[in-house]
């Protein structure tokens, strides 16, 4: 099993990702694809007159402020535009893909956060009423059914809360959870940079390898900028869960998954 998280920033080559994933799937490789959609969500939110707002948390992670209107836009883009675009591309390449959100069949269930801490002007504040949360349960029986029937699952937030509300959840954490649950051979994070950079945004400063026992060292955690912090935290979670290899790699190139598995990017092992 290989779990691939496809980022949602500008510059992602979805056609190349789909072609590579379909090729692996046709060779008999079991795959789970998880995707984002942040850049498209920002565009749609702006077009609808409800521009995005982001919160920076005390640990440095950045998340989308998700009121009910934002949640609806999030669902439009993640469950609709991006998910079905990937499914269409995979079908064109001969892979029998099926797209699901965490709401479908209670695939991803978690706890809605009652309050979110964030930093503004150097002060820690609390935001309430956000539709965000953390996935704690996966409907593995549903995924197993699809995998055994020969489908390629394409998965996306939102998840379902214990109160049966849609909640914006972190796709990087979902990918790490799935990789741990399935004892994946590898967890691949594809984004619009070639991996972790020692001197962001200088792509020549790519960090080629991080020893698995050192992934939580401050010197490596400090390399993660912006939303990359969540991917690194996902890698930490996966490593703790027994996943032997995590790769941060480039989604702008041809054959991005194969190249990641061959050692391109930043490899944690």
Swiss-Prot record:
Pfam assignment, any one: AA_kinase
Residues the record lists as binding ATP: 5-8, 78
EC number assigned by the record: 2.7.2.17
Effect recorded for residue 230 to E: Still binds LysW, but shows reduced activity
Entry keyword annotation includes Nucleotide-binding: yes
Cellular compartment(s): Cytoplasm
Pathway: Amino-acid biosynthesis; L-lysine biosynthesis via AAA pathway; L-lysine from L-alpha-aminoadipate (Thermus route): step 2/5
InterPro entries hit by this protein: AceGlu_kinase-like_sf, AcgluKinase_fam, Asp/Glu/Uridylate_kinase, Glu/AcGlu_kinase, LysZ
Predominant location category: cytoplasm
GO terms for cellular component: cytoplasm
Site for Transition state stabilizer, residues: 5, 231
Swiss-Prot/TrEMBL keywords: Amino-acid biosynthesis, ATP-binding, Cytoplasm, Kinase, Lysine biosynthesis, Nucleotide-binding, Transferase
Annotated GO MF terms: acetylglutamate kinase activity; ATP binding; N2-acetyl-L-aminoadipate kinase activity
Annotated residues for binding of substrate: 64, 168
Record-stated family: Belongs to the acetylglutamate kinase family. LysZ subfamily.
Function noted in UniProt: Catalyzes the phosphorylation of LysW-gamma-alpha-aminoadipate. Does not phosphorylate N-acetyl-glutamate.
UniProt name for this protein: [LysW]-aminoadipate kinase
Organism: Thermus thermophilus (strain ATCC BAA-163 / DSM 7039 / HB27)
Lineage start: Bacteria, Thermotogati, Deinococcota, Deinococci, Thermales
Gene name, Swiss-Prot/TrEMBL: lysZ
